[in-house]
Amino acid sequence: MSYRGRGGGYNNNRGQFSSGPHQHQQNVDSFVAANQYPIEIMGWNGASSGECINFISRKCKVIVSNYSVDSNSGVLKGYVKNESQANTLLNWSGVKFAGQSLRFSKGVSNISNQMGGGASTGSQSTIETISQFLKARYQPEIKMLNLSNVKQDPTLTAQGFFGSLSVSSKFFPALMKVASDLKLDVDSIDLSNNELQDLQTLTSMAQTFPKLQNLSLQNNNFTKIKVFETWRHKLNFLRELILFNNPIVQTNDPAEIQTIKLELMKSFPRLVVLSGEILRNEQVLIANLSFPFESPETMFFQDEDSRNLATNFIANYLKLWDANRSELMILYQNESQFSMQVDSSHPHLIESGNSGYSGSTDFGYYLNNSRNLTRVSSIKARMAKLSIGQEQIYKSFQQLPKTRHDIIATPELFSMEVYKFPTLNGIMITLHGSFDEVAQPEVDGSASSAPSGPRGGSRYHSGPKHKRIPLSKKSFDRTFVVIPGPNGSMIVASDTLLIRPYTSDFPWKVQKLPSNPTAATPGVSATSTPSPLPPTTITTPQLAPPGTGPTTADLPADIKARLNQIQQELLVKILLETKLNINYGIMLCEQSNWDYQQASVNFKNSAASLPSDAFVQ
């Protein structure tokens, strides 16, 4: 039998591999060249950059490689294979991700290119032109930036900034980047008369001016309230918003008007004035949003015994956690439980002050074992991610990066609360702070989840190797339930670790709100505007001490059928203290995960924005 047709005979592969390293380099060059079409992504801040890239790969069937976050603009930048893939992503603009709408654009390497090249044909560069424009429009005496009617600005028009639709759409992102570099002190911005239909091009404004207090968007083309989701919980100091002469407010339906007000108050927690109308009591609002202690302490202990136990425990625990986690296993027993979850759902400021770390936060080492119950719905998956007993717990510890906690050198960066836990005759310790990742895990659990086979990489190992995940600073919250053991020892009955993006803004720091928020209305044009409705003041109900009222026996049968006894008792307690009706009471409990302390906090934060029919009349 001849094998001539199958392999060409002995040593017939000599010609195929004769080029050696030269051929290999050509392959590398070809791969690099094929993955160098830039793409930019906005509206991704509801989660981590890695989660966004994975979502795009699953949903859009396009792989974005070599991605990074621009620390100035917050834009997520990466590369796709060719222009065709870039066009595919452009067609996906508007797809929902982590509660926001993603927006794709063909990327660039600098602002001059971003403006399409045509914007720098004059003697001034693009950056210089935008800088001069900003300086001319900035009024430092009242801290106001006038960005109204930018398309009619003669300097910008002469430089070709609005010569095409693609260039026009990139103007505001470029402007915000330059404004960030100039570090303008801005309280008010006027964006009137700009033909705006949505806020996609203004996503980065929240990062550039996070403490903005007054904003005018009058004489634009906003038609839907959901466009403001782009800025939800990002402009947390916005006090006044002007929306005159927008289709969204040109309605006479009282229910629709009330819905608009409520949605805007949810998006901007300190919003007081909407188009001249007072929405809520500002003094009550400031009181509810202010930290209740004049000099907040980083540590709280229920008594002296709790202090002694907790401080010794935490100091020794973190020392071993950073040095040798195997020595911690003596603290865990067969019934001990450990779980870890990642919370990347809250937008966070991109901090560039961490030398030695990458600009973006990657949770790759944590996601595989994350037990975030808002994302893991399967009972089987939830149980699989709960470690019980020494063996499973140590295995979970090995899959987490090695760390360094500087609690001895910088105790002010940590906070701790300690309460007695009478159910088990122990104490509950909750520790908040941050840590440095200093080395990869002993066991890389993220690699085990890599797909294989025809749909997930080559089954013959010809695909790309597992990418090493960059290390970075991260913030955390960790709760221990510690009980006494034999011979004076201590046992960790429960250990819950929450990992979140790093921030240097700690809630136990003193953060004073402006005592006299400026009430100046940002740049209203001379055109006539409709007179505002008579102002109304919404008083905020306060938590009241429980008194005589309903009991669990008084709850409707259908409510009792779907709630356990503990939930029924909590619901009754909440109804008595908040005076909410039963529907809003259940909603509050569910959104607080049936936690009394969290429900109290959530009620105080949102009571001012609740309609009057939410309360028992």
From Swiss-Prot:
PANTHER family, sorted: NUCLEAR RNA EXPORT FACTOR, NUCLEAR RNA EXPORT FACTOR 1
Protein name: mRNA export factor MEX67
Compositional bias annotation for Low complexity: 445-459, 526-542
GO MF assignments: porin activity; RNA binding; tRNA binding; U1 snRNA binding; U2 snRNA binding; U4 snRNA binding; U5 snRNA binding; U6 snRNA binding
Cellular localization per UniProt: Nucleus; Cytoplasm
UniProt domain NTF2: residue ranges: 309-499
Every TAP-C domain range: 565-617
Subunit structure: Interacts with nucleoporin complex protein MTR2.
One family name in Pfam for this protein: LRR_NXF1-5
Compositionally biased region (Gly residues): 1-10
Main location: nucleus
Record key words, sorted: Cytoplasm, Leucine-rich repeat, mRNA transport, Nucleus, Repeat, Transport
UniProt-annotated stretches for the region Disordered: 1-24, 442-469, 513-554
InterPro entries: Leu-rich_rpt, LRR_dom_sf, Mex67_RRM, NTF2-like_dom_sf, NTF2_dom, Nuclear_transport_factor_2_euk, NXF_fam, TAP_C_dom
UniProt remark on domains: The NTF2 domain heterodimerizes with MTR2. The formation of this heterodimer is essential for mRNA export and binds to all of the nucleoporin-FG-repeats.
LRR repeats: 185-206, 211-232, 237-258
Domain of life, per lineage: Eukaryota
Family under the similarity heading: Belongs to the NXF family.
Cellular component GO terms, alphabetical: cytoplasm; nuclear pore; nuclear RNA export factor complex; nucleus
